[in-house]
């Protein structure tokens, strides 16, 4: 079982630092900020292996009317759900919002869902895929509707975001963390700092797609594996999923950390 109350209080303390950040307060008065927290399914804590998917930053997540931690956490806990999971992805899969966006349109969510469905088959999980996995982002705060992480926000708060993600790892305790944040020379920097924060050790680099165009970097830290790959946008999705699954299956079958 996940100790939700302790998890919540640990995160609340860190989100409060964002809410009193002078630069973020100035930004929020001109351009709305949105906040997100990691989501997990009802069956996640009892699942083996436990898989957490990570993106860079969420655009269009919860947007508070005022920048205050009590609005984020008190009452209905608008950005942290107790096992609510990602049912919303299935519920809105092909239903455009007011901006015309829907999860089925996103390569990121297509790969996430496809991989989760394959994990259900592989490990005989009996219910819907979203009950068994978790999803979050490196950056917990972003400019609303920004299509990519705001470097203005992210670069000065890397350490704080790393501390937040470390809390996620402590309470959710995933066996595998899938980082769709970039693994090439020009994109790897996004997750490099966090892997250094954990003293992670690279154990493998698996090529996928012809001519070694893309790779999945495999790291080990604190009893869990991190698979760092490219964002699915513009990449072959089926081979991406297939390569990830082969890595997970091999490590889960042979590694004593399970």
Q: Where are the regions a protein language model picked out?
A:
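C-terminal capping/extension of enzyme domains
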Residues: 1-11, 16, 151-166, 185-258
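A polyanion-binding, active-site-adjacent surface
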Residues: 2-172, 176, 182, 186-188
